Structures are given as C-alpha cells and as structure tokens.
C-alpha cells in the first residue's frame, strides 16, 4: 500500500490543480463578460461644427479633412469632384504634421502633432503642444504647450490624440512621450478649454487613440492601447477619469494597434488600426496602405463583441 501512496498523492495534487485552474478560467470569463459590456449606445450628432472661414470662402460640401501626411504638410481641407481641390495655405505647414483633430461648437479645430520620417531640430519641440485652427480667421497657432512632454530620439512621439467633451467644454488629450518598449509612462490629460487649466492627469497608460462614449450605463473614455492590440475604457464620473481602464475588446492580429475610434451606430464601433512600435515607420508614407478598419458590434444575446467586417 505504501508503494502506491506517492501515486495517490500525485493524482490528488493533479486533480486539485485542475479544479483550481477550471475555477480560475471560469471566473476570468465571467469577469471579462461583465467588463466588456458598456451598455447600449447610439451614434449621436457631434456638437462640433466646421470652421466658419470655409463658409466665407464659399467652399462647397462635402469637405474632408486631410491629415494623411502624403500630399500636404499640416492640415488640408479637400473639396470638389473626387475631393480633387484643396484649401491649404503655406502658413499651415509651419508646425509640420498632425495626428488627430477635433472641432468645437464654434468651429475651432484643435490638433495634436505627429513626427514624420525626417527628424529636424524643431520636430521634438512640436510634440508638446496642442494646436488651434481659428474658426473665423483660419489662423493656425499653438494653443497650449505642456512642457513636461519631452519627445526625443528614443521615442519621437508626444501628445498624440484628443477628443472634445461637449458636456463641459473640455479636452481629453493623451501623451506617450516618456514610454519605451518595456515601460508604459503615458498620460491622459483633462483640460478646461476656457482656462487651459489641467483638471486631471491619469498616469500609466499609453493611449494611441481616445474617444468619448455615452451609454445607458454611463460615460466612458475609450482608449486604443499603443502597447497591445486591445481596446480599453475608463469610467468617467463627475467629470473625473477612473484610475485604471478595463479591457473591452482584443483584435485578432497581435501586431495591430487601434489608431482611431468612431461610433458608427447602435452598439457599433469602427476601429482603424496600424502597426505601431514607438518608431516613425508605423505612421508614415508607405505604411498608410496597411491600415485596417474593423466594425465591431456588441451582441447582447451572446454577451460579446463581434467583428462584422474587415477591409
């Protein structure tokens, strides 16, 4: 009997371990299911409007904003047949390229910077400012500089994405300047537009993209991670961001990063992705043709997000 005792003990240990792993696995599934549900939401009209100077110039609709970095430096407005014409004054080139923009109710445009293939002495300095295109005059200028943002040779990125909060006239802005391949030191800033006061800083997450979403369950800041292929959400309560985000969705391709988030319809999001590794190649020139778009929709009966199509 003693001869078989070690075998019995081994089998007992294996059985207990399997039971523990089973319980851990199922507890994770249940937790993930709860976290993934943002509540029912719809696409809503934005409070932002197009700049008034475009009306003064009698630019016809439709008008598209071009930040592609392929033909124009800075920002350009495209219009006419097949968007073949443009509004792009030389003065709009002075701050190099931009990564994202948002419009406010007056038609002012706020933009975050973007380093390009060729690094110049002025490039790193550009990455710590938010820029404003005046709705009436069309003048492009530095709106606010955050001096603690310090892009450099190891990581040329600084302020990278933003969204406008129609509820309280504020901006949510992300920066990834102090991060590297191993450590996440990103910051999300909440800024009052009227006073330029930083209302809140949340450290420790590299948000490559940000998007506000309001649902029947609450208000969230959706963020696409620069470090992995997942979409996350911060809770917003009393105009304050929660200390840490919760995971919402994971892409099937591990090298893709969510660069842009759009609300397309009922419980429907569109995610634009790029490869990203804290180097310039992911955002420039030839890499434009490997961007992907995914439409994901929350299926309440299956309690999960589903990819509707990819192209």
Language-model-derived ranges and their functions:
Residues 69-72, 120-127, 179-185, 226-227, ...:
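Short, solvent-exposed loop/turn segments at conserved positions within beta-propeller repeat blades
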Residues 106-108, 167-169, 217-220, 266-268:
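Short coil/turn segments that connect the beta-strands within blades of beta-propeller domains
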């Amino acid at each position: 009997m003693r001869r078989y005792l070690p075998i019995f003990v081994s089998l007992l240990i294996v059985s207990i371990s399997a039971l523990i792993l089973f319980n851990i696995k199922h507890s994770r599934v249940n937790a993930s299911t709860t976290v993934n549900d943002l509540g029912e939401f719809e696409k809503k009209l934005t409070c932002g409007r197009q700049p008034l100077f475009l009306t003064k110039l009698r630019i016809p609709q439709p008008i598209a904003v071009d930040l592609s970095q392929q033909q124009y430096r800075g920002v350009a407005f495209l219009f006419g047949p097949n968007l073949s014409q443009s509004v792009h004054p030389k003065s709009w080139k002075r701050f190099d390229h931009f990564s994202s923009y948002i419009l406010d109710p007056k038609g002012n445009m706020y933009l975050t910077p973007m380093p390009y293939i060729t690094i110049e002495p002025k490039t790193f300095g550009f990455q710590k400012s938010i820029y404003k295109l005046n709705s009436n005059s069309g003048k492009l200028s530095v709106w606010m500089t955050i001096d603690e943002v310090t892009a450099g040779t190891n990581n040329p990125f600084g302020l990278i994405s933003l969204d406008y909060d129609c509820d309280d006239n504020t901006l949510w802005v992300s920066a990834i300047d102090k991060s590297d391949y191993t450590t996440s030191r990103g910051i999300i800033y909440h800024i009052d537009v009227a006073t330029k006061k930083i209302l809140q800083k949340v450290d420790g997450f590299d948000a490559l993209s940000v998007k506000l979403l309001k649902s029947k369950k609450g208000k969230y800041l959706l963020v696409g991670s620069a470090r992995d292929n997942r979409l996350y959400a911060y809770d917003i309560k009393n105009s304050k961001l929660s200390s840490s985000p919760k995971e919402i969705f994971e892409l099937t391709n591990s090298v893709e990063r969510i660069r842009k988030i759009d609300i397309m319809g009922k419980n429907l999001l569109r995610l634009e992705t790029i490869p990203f590794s804290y180097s310039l190649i992911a955002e420039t020139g030839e890499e434009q043709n490997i961007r992907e778009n995914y439409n994901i929709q929350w299926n309440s009966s299956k309690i999960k997000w589903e990819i509707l199509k990819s192209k």
